[in-house]
Design a protein with these regions (language model features):
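Short amphipathic alpha-helical segments embedded in low-complexity Lys/Glu-rich regions
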Residues: 6, 109, 172-173
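Membrane-interface alpha helices of multi-pass inner-membrane proteins
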Residues: 1-21, 137-144
Length: 180
């Protein structure tokens, strides 16, 4: 959780991986010990570690940087508010260029809720496969980030070989015979 705290200090998206990573570490903890720890206590403990690490890093930044709120605005506000609409490989810039400015805040909220909704849906549906949830969410983030980079896609593509045993099961027209 400390590494997730460091990553969340730099960007918002890693914080969305908290629930699947807690599930992954909880499953690992229950396999190692004879009795399972309390789920709410385990989650609260790890959430406290995440909050403490992010708060500690933000506190250090406040001491080091003269204009702390400028740092927060440049780090988190830039990702949340999407002020730069120059063309990039992402989808958001095109949607926001085509719409009226009066609808901008509404659609910013809709886009963020859309991306965050995958966390709950995938976690509930694929509870027994938390590593797959993390991999799938990294792919979703690579597609739906406002300012994606090649490293987002490469991280997702690097995790795909973990599931190569599922490649023959993919359903595409050329690879599967038609059975009617």
């Amino acid at each position: 959780m400390l590494a997730l705290g460091f990553a969340s200090y730099l960007s918002i998206y890693p914080a969305l991986l908290f629930i699947p990573l807690v599930l992954l570490s909880y499953d690992r903890k229950t396999q190692e010990s004879k009795h399972a720890p309390s789920t709410p206590a385990f989650t609260v403990q790890h959430f406290a570690i995440l909050l403490a690490s992010v708060a500690g890093l933000l506190g250090l930044s406040c001491l080091v940087i003269e204009d702390f709120w400028e740092f927060v605005s440049a780090t988190y506000g830039f990702q949340l508010l999407v002020p730069d609409l120059t063309p990039n490989v992402g989808l958001w810039w095109y949607f926001f260029i085509e719409m009226f400015d009066s609808f901008r805040e509404f659609f910013l909220g809709v886009f963020w809720l859309h991306m965050a909704s995958y966390v709950g849906g995938l976690t509930v549906r694929l509870r027994r496969q938390p590593l797959f949830i993390v991999s799938a969410l990294l792919g979703v983030f690579a597609i739906f980030k406002p300012y994606p980079s090649i490293s987002d896609a490469s991280l997702y593509l690097a995790l795909l070989p973990l599931y190569r045993h599922l490649f023959p099961c993919k359903s595409s027209l050329p690879s599967c015979p038609c059975r009617y």
